[in-house]
Amino acid sequence: MVTVSEIRKAQRAEGPATILAIGTANPANCVEQSTYPDFYFKITNSEHKTVLKEKFQRMCDKSMIKRRYMYLTEDILKENPSLCEYMAPSLDARQDMVVVEVPRLGKEAAVKAIKEWGQPKSKITHLIFCTTSGVDMPGADYQLTKLLGLRPYVKRYMMYQQGCFAGGTVFRLAKDLAENNKNARVLVVCSEVTAVTFRGPSDTHLDSLVGQALFGDGAAALIVGSDPVPEIEKPIFEMVWTAQTIAPDSEGAIDGHLREAGLTFHLLKDVPGIVSKNIDKALVEAFKPLGISDYNSIFWIAHPGGPAILDQVEQKLALKPEKMRATREVLSEYGNMSSACVLFILDEMRKKSTQDGLNTTGEGLEWGVLFGFGPGLTIETVVLRSVAI
């Protein structure tokens, strides 16, 4: 008769959780940041608020964003005027959009990841679905299972309403699932649609305007598993260590509340200061066991909450400008896509590393860090190891 410890050992994988594929998707509607203030104030019938528009123009100019992708087109907004007012009851209209669009966009990203993975979708054992865009029962995880035609006994985990740090959370969960379940193949999907947060401008709620200047729509997917099948599965990154912490004295720094008017966001001005003040401690905990204290010697994937956060982290750690290249590139080309951002950055990094003829997926370096920042203020830390190209 086998013992419990023997059963447990047999259930576990041998090697570390490995990212085996990455896929991304965006809505077709591309919005240029340079012309967005004109569009935004026109569609929300706020052109008379000239001083506020000038403030918003400055926010957009300083955002370091060139373009974003949005499900909400001019036609959709004209058909749903309640979304264009500030704090008008509009949750039903928003929910009707996102309960369809979030799984649909997630499917686009997942199909690309599954294609790169090269294995039949019947080998997917677990699904993690993450979104801050609306809620529903059964959830977006269920809808995606149906859209992809996954097996009904895939083990699903639905993450609703976590915010921007959740891009790091999905790595932590996928790592635990892959390493503790032999032969597990975890499909991870983050899908975010700003139809829940779009609203007209307000003179009294400028942090709402910050969100209107930064947020974009996107979905990204990973396939994660331990012990890759030789010749069939091609590792991209290994996940070595993860942590989550709440920054001290940060209550109320980033809040989101789902109300009749949709999802409202509240930001304190000093979010960049809180992040930069706490990042050193997170790095020491993560990299001291590896004997690494030079943070220019690792590759960087940081959630781009906004340019000020990246600037202050760079300054605090004396990082070379190229360390945040992939992060800034994604911010510039897509805006802040909440949880999906760090997956996009990972994809950008491995592609650019190959294009530049570097010898690893992590810009030619072996070790790297992935950070998620969001409500709480919560910080997710993931230590990654690159793979030889």
Curated annotation (Swiss-Prot):
The keyword Chloroplast does not apply. This is Chalcone synthase 2. PROSITE patterns: CHALCONE_SYNTH (PS00441). The gene is CHS2. The active site is at 164. Belongs to the thiolase-like superfamily. Chalcone/stilbene synthases family. GO terms for molecular function: naringenin-chalcone synthase activity. It catalyses: (E)-4-coumaroyl-CoA + 3 malonyl-CoA + 3 H(+) = 2',4,4',6'-tetrahydroxychalcone + 3 CO2 + 4 CoA. It is an enzyme of class 2 (transferase). Pathway: Secondary metabolite biosynthesis; flavonoid biosynthesis. GO terms for biological process: flavonoid biosynthetic process; polyketide biosynthetic process. Transmembrane segments: none annotated. Keywords: Acyltransferase, Flavonoid biosynthesis, Transferase. Its EC number is 2.3.1.74. InterPro entries: Chalcone/stilbene_synt_C, Chalcone/stilbene_synt_N, Chalcone/stilbene_synthase_AS, Polyketide_synthase_type-III, Thiolase-like. Gene3D superfamilies: 3.40.47.10. The primary product of this enzyme is 4,2',4',6'-tetrahydroxychalcone (also termed naringenin-chalcone or chalcone) which can under specific conditions spontaneously isomerize into naringenin.
